[in-house]
């Protein structure tokens, strides 16, 4: 059973067992409301019917979504969407779907997709974990991307980090055998946490050949934020795991 409680404008669903014990659920985000610019709002109005997917408790049919069969790349938390649009532009042979809860980011992504004339990109504005639970067919994803998620750097907040054992198992089921989970972070402590979780997760193999990390792949665009970090001497850690079973 569940109880719904409202807190700071957000809705939290608390799952309970039959004897009243709390079941901690994974959460992929902390909601951040924001105001859309006129351009973002216009992009939402003009493009949602063709590029937006509404949340529903029903599995997606990728062939129906994209009107073709192609490898599916899913990104969790794409921010303002610039990198996702860039990746979709340079890989027209693949189909991309981005999930983001920040509506201005979704609007900005649709603006970029419209300006670029993309037909291989879809977006959702919802909690990624619920989307995975209810809408993503098992064994259907070629790649899952998680770039620069909230590091929750305070020790007492580490339990809020999205990369946890249950999350790794959920993703494993949705990836194809041989599919990849690509992560990137600019927090070394979070990178270490990611490696610790993923190295222990069954059914995955770290693709790094020397140590735990890989060089930034050419297909992951260098963001302005990341380039600035490089100039200031800040590190970025990329990790890629394949589903083996």
UniProtKB/Swiss-Prot annotation:
Belongs to the class I-like SAM-binding methyltransferase superfamily. TrmB family. It catalyses: guanosine(46) in tRNA + S-adenosyl-L-methionine = N(7)-methylguanosine(46) in tRNA + S-adenosyl-L-homocysteine. InterPro entries: SAM-dependent_MTases_sf, tRNA_(Gua-N-7)_MeTrfase_Trmb, tRNA_methyltr_TrmB_bact. One of its GO terms (molecular function) is tRNA (guanine(46)-N7)-methyltransferase activity. This is tRNA (guanine-N(7)-)-methyltransferase. Substrate binds at residues 154, 186, 223-226. GO terms for cellular component: tRNA methyltransferase complex. It comes from Photobacterium profundum (strain SS9). Pathway: tRNA modification; N(7)-methylguanine-tRNA biosynthesis. It comes from the Bacteria. The gene is trmB.
């Amino acid at each position: 059973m569940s109880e719904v409680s409202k807190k700071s404008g957000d809705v939290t669903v608390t799952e309970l067992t039959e004897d009243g014990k709390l079941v901690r659920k994974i959460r992929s985000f902390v909601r951040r409301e924001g105001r859309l610019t006129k351009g973002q709002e216009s992009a939402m109005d003009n493009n949602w019917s063709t590029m937006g997917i509404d949340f529903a408790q029903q599995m997606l049919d990728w062939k129906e979504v994209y009107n073709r069969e192609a490898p599916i790349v899913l990104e969790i938390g794409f921010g303002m969407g610039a990198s996702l649009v860039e990746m979709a532009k340079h890989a027209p042979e693949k189909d991309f779907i981005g999930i983001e809860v920040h509506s201005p980011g979704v609007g900005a992504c649709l603006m970029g997709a419209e300006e670029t004339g993309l037909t291989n990109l879809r977006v959702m504005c919802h909690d990624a974990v619920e989307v995975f639970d209810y809408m993503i067919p098992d064994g259907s994803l070629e790649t899952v991307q998680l770039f620069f998620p909230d590091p929750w750097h305070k020790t007492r907040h580490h339990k809020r980090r999205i990369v946890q054992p249950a999350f790794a198992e959920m993703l494993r089921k949705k990836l194809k055998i041989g599919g990849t989970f690509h992560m990137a972070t600019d927090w070394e402590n979070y990178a270490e946490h990611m490696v610790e979780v993923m190295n222990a997760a069954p059914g995955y193999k770290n693709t790094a050949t020397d140590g735990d990390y890989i060089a930034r792949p050419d297909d992951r665009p260098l963001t302005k934020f990341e380039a600035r970090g490089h100039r200031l001497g800040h590190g970025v850690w990329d990790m890629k795991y394949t589903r083996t079973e």
